[in-house]
Amino acid sequence: MCLRADCAGSNKPIAKPDCKRFGCSAGAKGGFCFTVGRWGVSLVKRSFMTNSSSLGSYDILTKRFSGRVQFAHHFLPCPNIRHVLFDFDGTLSLIREGWPEVMLPMFEEMLPPTSGDEPAGARAMLLDDIMTLNGRQTIFQMMKFAERVAERGGVPLHPLEYKHEYLRRLEVRIQSRVNRLSGDAADPVEFLLYGSIALLDGLVARGWSLYLGSGTDEPNVKREAELLGLDGYFGEHIYGAQDDYKSFSKKQVIERILTENQVDGDRLMVIGDGYVEIEDGKNVGGLAVAVASDEDNNGAGRFDEWKRKRLLGVGADIVIPDYRDAAVLLDVIEGK
């Protein structure tokens, strides 16, 4: 039985078959950050109190990890998962690593100045807009920027025009990476988040169905998945953004997975570094693994603190920096 209390003020558990995970726990609030290093396991209390038995169970779990991991207070194993939805950029692929360094300067360049404008303040505002919308289709960042232009008395371009110019600039940045991969001059692992293949192989070995949903335009996602050797894991289940932004969303992908397979949300796990897939997965009762990846330092095993805090805030069950502990992670999720 799954006694899952949704965090909407209700203390009444909702019964579902087979799963043993809570969406909300009355006995604990907040989360713990566990760091495994040379001197063993350290437990850092974030912002809540819990009972000693809970502390003990978390401690036992994290001793199994060689790297960093953070469990939300509501995490419990869910052994009935059979479908897994991945985000792409920053979750598996690093081909587009550094994309904010393209988008932010473009926005700064095109943002109308105002009297008494503080460049640092405008930059912080734009960066917050960009990262808050990370995980959604690129067009939403462009729509938000168009609003900022109008707020300052400017006449914004159509959001698609901003998007196409951004993609043109981004293509210049990543072209050498694409060329190296397509010409076999680079090993795909160089542009995969650390441990990605081990995780994917572990999921395939369990017989779980894999899906890829990205805010990047679908033709680019399919091209880059193929360059990285990931297309075989996902087959026809690779979905990406369209110019008609209303025709695609990660929420729609999740609804399609559940409908076509005639399953409830507790059969679903979402894995991503953006708030959208985490939030959408949790909204249907799925388990959410947040990847707070430090893309600039792949393999270092460090959290990106902005991602970590943001993803915990939208309900992530587990936060990891990469997949160095892929086998342990899957065992813990299954309750082994």
Predicted regions and their residues:
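Active-site neighborhood of HAD-like aspartate-dependent phosphohydrolases
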Residues: L55-A124
